[in-house]
Amino acid sequence: MKIPQEFDTIRPWEPEDLPEVFDRLLSNDQFKQVLAYLYPQVPFEMIAQKLKACKTNLDFQLAFAYDFVQGILKKAATGCEMDCAAIDNTRNYTFISNHRDIVLDSASLDVMLIDNGFKTTCEIAIGDNLLSLPWVKDLVRVNKAFIVERALSMRQMLMSSKRLSDYMHFAIKEKNENIWIAQREGRAKDSDDRTQKSILQMMAMGGEGSIIERLKQLHLVPLSISYEYDPCDFLKAKEYQQKRDVEGWKKGPMDDLISMQTGIFGYKGHVHYHAAPCIDEYLDTLDPEMPKQELFNTIAAHLDHEIHSHYRLYPGNYVALDLLENTEAHASEYTPEDKARFEKYIAGQLAKIQLPDKDEAFLKEKILAMYANPVRNFLATK
């Protein structure tokens, strides 16, 4: 397929790009080290041969990514499933979800789509702040990622957003791909998931017709992702204290790398994906004459309601809310054993935090809020 040249800097690698990209990857020492770590018993030549046999991005995902993610979920989760009864696996959609884990939110979704009979996986929106190493950028583009450019001037940001939106519309309409995009820029560190209006505004820059028609062309599906345990909870809490105590503190590239590694390999308990109905029909019920900002706010609120109301809540979520509010209002949702297990887990996560002036009470409150907020949001939809 002929891809417009304007997308060259952000699009995933296409099948015709793959031979050259594979050669680049296979000659990179860091990539070789990763392969040696992941496949200690397999000769490099055999992996190279298997990689070069992949003619499409989906071939690569089925040959490498699928088994890798399945292996992670087997070791670091007690189960992972997706409820997609509300959507049609013969169609393609833009999944817009809450964002917990840098890598696995979208990687596990790909596995779930394959397991649920979808004809293809997702093209994934990923920020260029996570792609400082050229070989990592190559690898994610092989794995069907398209790039969201960050840290731009206002003028550059407008041009970049328009190109990004045009590409998303092209991927859905012309390439017949699915797309995954987070409902906000970056993870919601406190798990209080809210759709950023700016994401919807960006998506409505591409396509044709009114705002409602443009968003309908992307076939948006609100997706709720629920992890029983977030392996990065202690890192997120640590970040809160660093931001509080150190003026102008900012994450470095190593922080993202540690979060990615911890998120992939850390224990997650149960993981659940729930796809709400595609919002095309809902969009048809809206008044197209509504003022633009009100329209975006209304659509964002609908997405939030769908995501919040379809969370899978675990006993630990209710324990966290009761501990935070010093009550037993939700004690019917957990047993004394559940509570003891969760409190032990929290103590273990707090013990991992290394800080010079460690504020235990503040850190504990932040971690508990991460587990309590999904309950608050879920209850607010009832």
List each language-model region with its residue ranges.
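Long, low-complexity C-terminal extensions of enzymes
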Residues: 295, 307-382
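C-terminal structural cap/anchor segments
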Residues: 258-324
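Soluble or luminal CAZymes and related metallo-dependent hydrolases
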Residues: 64, 160-164, 295, 299
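A near-ubiquitous, low-amplitude feature marking generic local secondary-structure context
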Residues: 4-8, 17-18, 30, 34, ...
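Soluble catalytic domains of membrane acyltransferases
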Residues: 58, 67-279, 350-353
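Membrane-anchoring hydrophobic helices of lipid-metabolizing enzymes
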Residues: 1-93, 99-110, 114, 137, ...
